Every structure is written in C-alpha cells, then in structure tokens.
Amino acid sequence: MAKIPVTVLSGYLGSGKTTLLNHILQNREGRRIAVIVNDMSEVNIDKDLVADGGGLSRTDEKLVELSNGCICCILRDDLLKEVERLVKKGGIDQIVIESTGISEPVPVAQTFSYIDDELGIDLTAICRLDTMVTVVDANRFVHDINSEDLLMDRDQSVDETDERSIADLLIDQVEFCDVLIINKIDLISEEELAKLEKVLSALQPTAKIIKTTNSEVDLKEVLNTQRFDFEKASESAGWIKELESGGHASHTPETEEYGISSFVYKRRLPFHAKRFNDWLESMPNNVVRSKGIVWLAQYNHVACLLSQAGSSCNIHPVTYWVASMSEAQQTQILAERQDVAAEWDPEYGDRHTQFVIIGTELDEEKLTKELDACLVNAQEIDADWQQFEDPYQWQIRPAR
C-alpha cells in the first residue's frame, strides 16, 4: 500500500492558514483529502467543502477537531491515533493538518518520524510527512517580530505556564518549513514586500517562497510535493547555515541590495556576564535573529545557548564544556569526537563563543566592537571570575 502524503499548515493566528485550507478543498480536483484541524477556538473551516464530494462527508468523520490546545507532546497521542484511524479506514489520497496558530511545527513533524511502542502505532509505515507549509502575514510579520508581547499578553497562551513570546513563535514557524507562503501581499508596498522576502530568505534560505493574496496557491506547491526531509529541515534555518559556513554562506546581491546581511561572531575569550547581558538588553532593533553558543566567565564550566528573535532574547546553560570534565572523560570524548579535537585549545579546551547575527542594515564592525568590549579584558583575565557581578544567578553543579 502506498503511503499517504501528509501536509502540515503552520502560521501565526490570522496569517491565512484556514483560508489556505478552504482554497485546497475548493480546488482539490478529485483528490480525496482528509483534514485534521487543531485550533484553540471553534473549527472555522467551511465544513460544507469537506462534505461536498469525494466521499469526504461529515458522517465519515474525515473532518476532525482535536482537543483544545496546540499539537504538542500532550496531544501527540491524539494525533497519532487520529492519523492511523484515517489511513486504515481508507478512501483518502492525502491528509492535511491545520495546526493552531500558537503551535510550533517541530513536534508535529516528530510525530511522523518515530514508532510509538506504547500505543503500538508506526505512522512511518502507513504515511509520510510530505510538506511543511508556513503561512506568514505580510502586513503583520515585521510588527509582530518586533513586539515584546508574550502569547499570554494577547490571551493566546496554552495555559498560565506558557511564557513563549510572539517573536520566538514566529521564528520557530519560519525556520522549520519547506514551503513559505507570504500572504496578504496586497496590504504592503512592493518595496516592503521585497525587503520582507529577503528577511525571510535569510531566516529560512532553503524553503520555496510563494507570494500571494487570500492564500491562493497552486496546489502542486503544497500537496504531494515530496519536499520534506526531517534531517534537512532540522538543518535548514539560516543561522545554522551561517554557522556551518563559518560566516561565509553565500549571500545573493538582491539580499545585500535590501540591506539584509549576517555574520558570525567567534571568540576564544569569555564574556563578562554583566556586560554581555547589558548589551543584550540594548541590542539594536535591526538585529532580527541571533543564535549560537556563548562562553560566560562567571559560568566557566558550562556552555550557554543564546537565542534571540526580534525583541525576544533568551540565554541559558545547555551543557558542560568538555574541558570542565575529568581527564578520563576528556580523553574519551576527544578520541570519539574529531570535531571537538580539531578545535581544542591548549589553554581553554573547547570553550568558545560562536553565534550568528542576522539583520537589516547591520554595521558588522560596530557590533563586533561592542561585543568585544563585553569580553573579559586584560585587567580581568587573571582575576577570580566568580567574583564578577552576575545578572543570572544560575545554580549549576560543577561537572564531575
């Protein structure tokens, strides 16, 4: 039996996902499409479209609403069961999943990439994730990416523990897709559209970009495209490409024309946490995205992850430096990891800072000087770094 292709529609609230879903159903040309809807509010797609022809009647329950919330770990069991039920029932050529506007696409993709032994469900045997589509509102994206709002500020959070920012969510949705639809282009000027397209291309350089109004696209671009590859999608974000190239990723002349650029900041000295935190809090608003590994003097034994999207910025410890581990552990890891061994410094080991900065009209020289001023200087290098002012106050045990 041929595996059923699955298309996932992602995008922030109001971007046009539901309009796209209606467009797909209105123009399906004989395709038998099962729809899984996951939304915080009432299902608002035109159910008559599902009932109209192709055996997609409401009595067949081909239109499914999952429980309130976002498609995430909690609801993955529901999604697994529903997809399996639809495929085994038969009579469909394609599944389209409309994610809620506040969900990240990665958990959905993960659902189709592993076997759930507990439930006894193996979706990889009966269907394949075919296309990850993200819809962007051309008129709102720049405003929302620069907003300091959290989802809860707009009454859009899953629950009271959901502290995600709008900017982080938008970046997550853009960075993990293989088709990126810029919708509502009639609401902005040609120059604004050209610049937005280049910003999105910098954030997600491998996705197919489609510009449209009213989410009207050729269905061949979103159904049965065979575009999706989990490994490639996981490595397709612009910041990853830039880091992998060491800051020498190819930048098109058109991108540079609109002032979109990126560079990698890499140093073998630690940041003074207070000075670096001050810089993060006053980061220029033309920095759209920055992400990578940071070495902080006050936390000499751990590597920290910096992730900034628009006005949202987060830094936290993620792993121990190999250099902070026991000699036996170091020897074993260096023998197994050629990438770590190749970058090993006689004094600092694997400790380093390396992150990418993507933005508009970036002054690389000025930003680099500002960041260099945050590094531990010559007068501080031999001091007790633990005595430096610490804005984070993380409680982390030393590596063993």
Language-model region placement:
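C-terminal accessory "lid"/substrate-recognition subdomains
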Residues: 2, 42, 141, 150-353, ...
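Solvent-exposed alpha-helical segments within well-ordered globular domains of core cellular machineries
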Residues: 22-23, 81-85, 110, 194, ...
